[in-house]
């Protein structure tokens, strides 16, 4: 892989780490907790500077980072130790990392979404010739809201529900003329690719939503919600045995994926990072 792409992947990954640890740092300082060190990276130090009571360091391995608070890992008698502040403050400090990831993720998503001139919606605009789904009862204008029980916020939720299903048929819940309707037992045509892998022919088309300020905000929010849902369902699938560990991407795989995506453009690269943020 091109070294530049690897570096871009590492940079994006570190932005996520910095935002996460900064959330812990800024809330800890707000509540008067003593922060001994704020580190970017892991392993031996290659650079450090002392500012006030906190040592800021950069470490040799560009993966991870930490915010070392007094009394975080062991009991301390210091009145400014993490273990000595009120429980509700500890909860806020601990939750601040994930909160910052959500905020930064939303900003990244907003930047990516804003590049599009229009957005693919979850509303059916038409069908392929001899469409099975149309014969089963789906209609143009139907807004897809569930597939096999999975909530649909964006088109990628439809893809996820279909690709990860262990059933041969699909139950759709749609909003039609303002009312919710169910269309059950849709069996898409099975296809076999040149490499021998099997696939399903999804025979309906989705419409588009025009870009304006409100739709950009809405699409960014829905994309974040969709990402959270897919992440949760993926981990749930791993726990229940539906998915294997090999299907989950760790930090190293994430950098490789981001690097590969970068060669296809900024939009794909940022989305790769965002989808691994939570």
Question: What does each model-found stretch correspond to?
Answer:
Residues 1, 5, 9, 86-94, ...:
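Residue-level signature of transmembrane alpha-helical entry/exit and packing/kink sites
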